[in-house]
Amino acid sequence: MAKFRLSLVQFLVSPVKSENLNRACKLIKEAAQKGAQIVALPECFNSPYGTKYFPEYAEKIPGESTERLSQVAKECGIYLIGGSIPEEDSGKLYNTCAVFGPDGTLLVKHRKIHLFDIDVPGKIRFQESETLSPGDSFSVFETPYCKVGVGICYDIRFAELAQLYSKKGCQLLVYPGAFNMTTGPAHWELLQRARALDNQVYVATASPARDEKASYVAWGHSTIVSPWGEVIAKAGSEETVISADIDLEYLAEIREQIPIRRQRRHDLYSVEEKKN
């Protein structure tokens, strides 16, 4: 199939987990009814984002949140990229994205590889590593349309991850994320366009809607970028669902017009996956 419909759900996360799950499922169903074949949720969609919240809201996988996602994916017959949730496993906490197929099967579980530890004096300091552990594996899943690579938020800053996903044959990269009011306006769109252009792939980012009263205020602006580096769909800060057609023939045309994949000097440099 040369084209498919991708939708990103940007919704206002509340402190009540059950409300978040109900709201997410409602918006997923609305997106599916409008023709979405792949739907993505935001980072930390079932809880407020913050190191003090991760232990309180953490779940096993499978657990309450992922069971709901599995059910709604099956009900709608879609591929569902389940944003991320705080996951507890063997005494450790992870920032984890679970992906489900149209039959409700768990296809892949991506644990955020690069933890969000930054300190911008006078603006923002955040240390995910205070409570979270990093993941150590790559996450690619197959669809009838194309291969899809998954990262979470801060993972997008690392060009190597996108390059490895591209080498694995991914034509769409999806990053549930929650940039803030400092890094959001400066880097959010720039990073997406860079990853799309560097690798000649579609890039999508799903953010929570902005809540000015939250302890961590998300930038919002969920976005879909083409392999030409063009923004083809973009939200504001409010709760919404955005959609775009992912056109794989267009992607192939771009790769033929500017054939950087054939022109790379593999005799001089490479980005390689390290095996454990």
UniProtKB/Swiss-Prot annotation:
Record function comment: Has omega-amidase activity. The role of omega-amidase is to remove potentially toxic intermediates by converting 2-oxoglutaramate and 2-oxosuccinamate to biologically useful 2-oxoglutarate and oxaloacetate, respectively.
Active site: E43 (proton acceptor), K112 (proton donor), C153 (nucleophile)
Keyword terms: Cytoplasm, Hydrolase
CC annotations in GO: cytoplasm
Name this polypeptide is given: Omega-amidase NIT2
UniProt subcellular location: Cytoplasm
PROSITE patterns (alphabetical): CN_HYDROLASE (PS50263)
Organism: Xenopus tropicalis
EC number: 3.5.1.3
Family under the similarity heading: Belongs to the carbon-nitrogen hydrolase superfamily. NIT1/NIT2 family.
Subunit record text: Homodimer.
Pfam families registered for this protein in UniProt: CN_hydrolase
